[in-house]
Amino acid sequence: NIADYYINGLPKIGAWRDMHIRIKGPAVEKLQEVFLTMWNKETKQQIGGDEYFPFGEDSLNAAPVHAGHQVAIVQRAPKISPEAMRHAYIAAINSAERKIQIINPYFTPTSSIRRAIEKAVNRGVRVEIMIPGKSDISFTPDAGFYLANQLRKKGAHIYVYNGGFHHSKVMMVDERFCTVGSTNLNSRSLRYDYEINAFVFDLPVTAQLTDIFSADKQNSTIMTKEVYKKRTPWKRFVGWFAHLFTPVL
């Protein structure tokens, strides 16, 4: 996102926190392909050619592996790959054996994502989910608090970030691989919008994100039954009511 308040924050939410990733090598060409496809569609231009794809066409069809590093670019496009992102997230969650860590700003997960998280908890995986205490929008965060509390009841560990608005969309699995991208864990991202994520199979990169998560815990409140009840009855009602609309949020 590009705007002044993404850099300077907003008075009602404080500092804006986000997560970006720099990718080098053949995996970039998939990002280039997605960008040019949308650019050409909107501008009616036909930009392309070998100069934009120096690694060749093969790089678009396979995730490259170099010295133990693997990057897969997953795109969700409504008419091309409508289920790709949902399937990628569910597969990642289902693969977890020890730990899942999620940071997501508009956390109103679809029923299939919630079921995958609950199954992970039931098989002994520690699931840690970080959501922002403040948001740049209304209604959706109330549903997010309600749904996060429901997952807390199932055994997930919920952290409410207090250091501003955490707009990051990341997930780490077993400290083995991670994903960083534009995808929110809500119906809009998984069913309607254009989204793109990098799934990075790399221990050092995943360790960096894990360290950031651990540091952010120090600036977070652990959601407990008592903490959730501190929300006003009206806020709790709005959360319950809002969650009924999660299929379109």
Model regions and ranges:
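Charged, low-complexity intrinsically disordered terminal segments
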Residues: 1-249
